[in-house]
């Protein structure tokens, strides 16, 4: 998770009380023409950390409040001859459907949340900081304030530079690495000595992500465009291939 939202998560969980706690319902809808295998990682861990979602299917999962974490969808999953569950994109390397506290291996499109207690201000985004593997959107349901949709509706794989492409078993581009994940250099990861927004402007690579998905995080300091808020205890709809 990018540094900016990570700081928000930590601060929010420190300041928010548990008074008036209620469950926030996450509804998942798969509009992709193929099955996906969503997964979760967060604090505290949710009742399920992985499930199968067929094309056009829906699923609901409650989070406690406060809660911080992320969701993503694995693609091209199967069980190998040894009985190990594996996925071509965003695999969490648990060897099974449940990720059990493990995060997805980049590249992966992420939906990230800080859910506040007592109807306070939630923070959420769709992030490409770890790369892209499928289109995704996050839509608040109810709530007060701006409550805008975060989204990456475009198929970034179609414009992914060759050096960032992840190639699947059939030879097609199945995901697109971020420049940070691919090269690990400060100019792309906004790490020392380029750890501030002033020292770490967008790069040509992050601009590709931003042009395709202007309502998603394209790199670590994209919070002015990619980070959204909603108050009053909303629920959320997470759509794959919106």
From Swiss-Prot:
Pfam families: Thaumatin
Gene Ontology, cellular component aspect: extracellular region
S-S bridge residues: 32-241, 77-87, 92-99, 147-230, 152-213, 160-176, 180-189, 190-200
Bilayer-spanning residue ranges: none
Tissue spec: Preferentially expressed in the abscission zone of fruit. Also expressed in leaf abscission zone.
Induction text: Up-regulated in the abscission zone following treatment with propylene and in both the abscission zone and surrounding tissues after wounding due to embryoctomy.
Recorded superkingdom: Eukaryota
Protein name: Thaumatin-like protein 2
């Amino acid at each position: 998770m990018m540094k900016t939202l990570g700081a928000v998560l930590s601060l929010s969980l420190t300041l928010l009380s548990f008074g008036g706690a209620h469950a926030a319902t996450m509804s998942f809808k798969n509009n992709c023409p193929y099955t996906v295998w969503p997964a979760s990682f967060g604090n505290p861990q949710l009742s399920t950390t992985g499930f199968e979602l067929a094309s056009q299917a829906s699923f609901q999962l409650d989070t406690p409040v406060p809660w911080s974490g992320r969701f993503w969808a694995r693609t091209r999953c199967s069980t190998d001859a040894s009985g190990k569950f594996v996925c071509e994109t965003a695999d969490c390397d648990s060897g099974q459907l449940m990720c059990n506290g493990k995060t997805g291996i980049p590249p992966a499109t992420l939906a990230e949340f800080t859910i506040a207690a007592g109807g306070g201000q939630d923070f959420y985004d769709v992030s490409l900081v770890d790369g892209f593997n499928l289109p995704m959107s996050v839509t608040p349901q109810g709530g007060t304030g701006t409550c805008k949709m975060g989204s990456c509706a475009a198929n970034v794989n179609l414009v992914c530079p060759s050096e960032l492409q992840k190639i699947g078993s059939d030879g097609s581009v199945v995901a697109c690495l971020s420049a940070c994940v691919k090269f690990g250099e400060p100019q792309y990861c906004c790490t020392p000595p380029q750890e501030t927004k002033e020292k770490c402007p967008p790069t040509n690579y992050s601009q590709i992500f931003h042009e395709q998905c202007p309502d998603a995080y394209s790199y670590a300091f994209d919070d002015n465009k990619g980070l959204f808020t909603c108050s009053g205890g909303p629920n959320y709809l997470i759509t794959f291939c919106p």
